[in-house]
Amino acid sequence: MASSDKAFTLDIVTPQKLFFSGEINSVIAPGLNGLFQVLKGHAPLLAALKSGKVRLSLSDRSEDTFQIAGGFFEVSGNKAILLTEEVS
């Protein structure tokens, strides 16, 4: 399954590089007030992030997890951008 009707685009960007760019079904991120999940069709959102784990559900049904050092998360249309100082 290369892409699905549930998928949307996510970019994870650091000052050094584009760390990830791809189609995902969902993302769970560490907001300042707790974890939040974003799916395709989410309302526009701008959220501050604290350090923690980001979990992606990829469009091929696999999962990936990254550790971030805080940052910001934006959703607009069917595209999301996660900006962070550091990711591993």
Curated annotation (Swiss-Prot):
It is found in: Cell inner membrane. F-type ATPases have 2 components, CF(1) - the catalytic core - and CF(0) - the membrane proton channel. CF(1) has five subunits: alpha(3), beta(3), gamma(1), delta(1), epsilon(1). CF(0) has three main subunits: a, b and c. Produces ATP from ADP in the presence of a proton gradient across the membrane. This is ATP synthase epsilon chain. It is a peripheral membrane protein. The keyword Cell membrane applies. It comes from Chlorobaculum tepidum (strain ATCC 49652 / DSM 12025 / NBRC 103806 / TLS). GO terms for cellular component: plasma membrane; proton-transporting ATP synthase complex. Its main location: membrane. Belongs to the ATPase epsilon chain family. It comes from the Bacteria. Keywords: ATP synthesis, Cell inner membrane, Cell membrane, CF(1), Hydrogen ion transport, Ion transport, Membrane, Transport. It holds the Pfam family ATP-synt_DE_N. GO terms for molecular function: proton-transporting ATP synthase activity, rotational mechanism.
